[in-house]
Amino acid sequence: MKHIVYQVLPRLWGNGRFSAWNESAFRYLSTLGVDCIWFTGVPRHASGKPFVKGDPGCPYSISDWKDVNPYLADNPDSRMAEFENLVARCHKAGFKVLIDYIPNHVACDYQGDVRHFDYCDGDWTDTLKNDWSDPRTFEAMLDILRFWLSKGVDGFRCDMVELVPADALRGLISALKAENPETIFVAEVYGKENYSLYSESVGFDLLYDKSGMYDSLRAICCNGYTARSLTWNWQWLGRLQPQMINFLENHDEQRAASREFLGSAPRGYAALAASLLFNTASFLLYFGQEVGENASEGAQGRTSIFNWCRPVSIGRLVDSVESGKRLPKAEAAVLRKYRELLGYAQLDAFSKGNVWDLCYCNYDSRGFDADRHFAFLRYDDSSAWLVVCNFSDRPADMSIAIPVEVQSACGCSCKAVCVDPWDAAVVRLK
């Protein structure tokens, strides 16, 4: 199933509390085709201590795995009940709820049953590395995940899984899937050589394709790398394509519209179309991305996960969602484009249909540049669509040849297409 996941730090949305997620917010996400909400920063993390990074601190430095952050509640004494109410509201509105699971480390002030060493990985100085050689850690983690499932959570985005024994993760997923088969497990994986292991052996439902699709798109857009790399990536993935989750942004990566990445949201439309529409892989949308949030208030093009901040465009987006206040023209235009492309992703031909990379048969086609253009078909029994992405500063006017093998599915053998710079054209053929 092609999921559209919306990642959000609830402390930076609206009033910064669970209560900000109301019918207006859910209606808004429905217009984007979102079906899963990943709430980042729910389990209680370290805050206000000398070792903590920032104020209120990092969501990945967990001090109590069976509590939620008090600052997310209207009444801190009722914070867990307020979280359960949030989950119930999400379910009523038709959304699944994901939270973070961090198996590699805990906060320096962690109190609980997970066994850990007295050192950290790298510069994660607000954490201590977990000791998975102690069987009590596995039992404690299984209990923690069961706890969150009992609260109604539908799945987990699992942090830095390559730093944890694969056998331990396999055991956790197997045990929990036996009890709750629909539980979703998303793996943050960076080594492409490990994709098959974590998908087919360990049992994750979705894997980050950061080292494939994301890195390829970034190299194409920022470094002039050839668009042929998109073909090479799916050929390498093969049968694993549906198990990937693609993205242009998340909390670890720079905002696409930041000066450190693309410089503007419109310059990312071609990359968005390729990442979102090429195959049945799921897609992750980071809050504010859809209006061109550029993290201008933060460092290095990232919205801070350590400090209180108020990204300006996210504030305007929330005002628009809650009160109907108009967005500035530029942000409204970005949102329209995102809604357009996300709308295509909901169609059967895109969400579960067939894909045909057209680049190989268009090297000599009029106007087609295999290094700067990417063209493909999405089709099923009822419709066929041509998508052409233009990764260049110049408008592209081209004729795209349709190979004989899929002409009956498309109803044509050739199609003329015009695509603006850094944009994508989506054309219905049938």
Regions found by a protein language model. Name each.
Residues 34, 150-153, 204, 280:
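A structural motif
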Residues 394-411:
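Beta-strand-rich binding/interaction modules
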Residues 4-6, 37-39, 97-99, 156, ...:
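Hydrophobic faces of well-ordered beta-strands that scaffold small-molecule active sites
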Residues 47, 250, 255-399:
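Loop/helix patches that line or flank the sugar-binding groove of alpha-linked glycan CAZymes
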Residues 415-430:
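C-terminal beta-strand-rich structural cap/linker in extracellular carbohydrate-active enzymes
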Residues 2-36, 41-151, 172-180, 194-196:
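Substrate-binding/active-site clefts of carbohydrate-active enzymes
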